[in-house]
Amino acid sequence: MSHKSNYRDGDSFTKQAKKAGYRSRAAYKLKEILEKELKLKRSSSVIDLGSFPGGWTQVLREFLGNKTKITAIDIQPMKKIEGCFFLQKSIIDLKDEDFEEIKEFLPFDLVLSDMAPNISGIKERDNALMINLIDSTLSVVDKFLGKKGSVLIKVFQGESLDYTRAALKKRFDKVKISKPKASRPNSNEIYIIGKELK
């Protein structure tokens, strides 16, 4: 067994996620942020960008209940979650007409993105790829997020964080940084929240 496998199996959040039936440990990141920072109503409409394998979508289903309006999008196929509309498509290639099928869900109350590029280790390249994903998320925000809506975006500390923070300050009344406990301490990831769309 590799060192990586040992670390993963020994990770408490990974064990908790498996025991609770979540598809990924990332479920606990969203749970913490929703409980502390983002208050959702049962009637909220939410889009989960980069949803595979579905951990965040599962948490949304828990928080929103049966009469849910959840849209999940990912380039990879995702096992069905009851009450969720799933579109298999690259976020970069999203078009306005892709939202026709869920027009009754619009506008969204919350846009989520847990997306990250495949890391090369080349800082400039990785940041550029991350910013491309952030721009795709911001496009959804600009077109489909309702007045006073919120956004949650995963970024890397450094250039992509600075870029996203500046972009959100132009769009939202409140901008905040979050590092959930389930995010590995040595990870460069951090989450940025925009609340109350102007």
Which residues fall in each region the model found?
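Class I SAM-dependent methyltransferase Rossmann-like catalytic core
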Residues: 1-42
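Helix-to-beta-strand junctions that scaffold the AdoMet/dcAdoMet cofactor pocket
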Residues: 41, 64-65, 144-147
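Conserved class I S-adenosyl-L-methionine
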Residues: 42-52
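Glycine-centered, small-residue-biased loops immediately flanking beta-strands
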Residues: 44, 68, 149
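Conserved SAM-binding loop of SAM-dependent methyltransferases across substrates and taxa
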Residues: 53-66
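S-adenosyl-L-methionine
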Residues: 75-120
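Mobile active-site "lid"/loop adjacent to the S-adenosyl-L-methionine
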Residues: 89, 106-148, 159
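Class I S-adenosyl-L-methionine
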Residues: 157-198
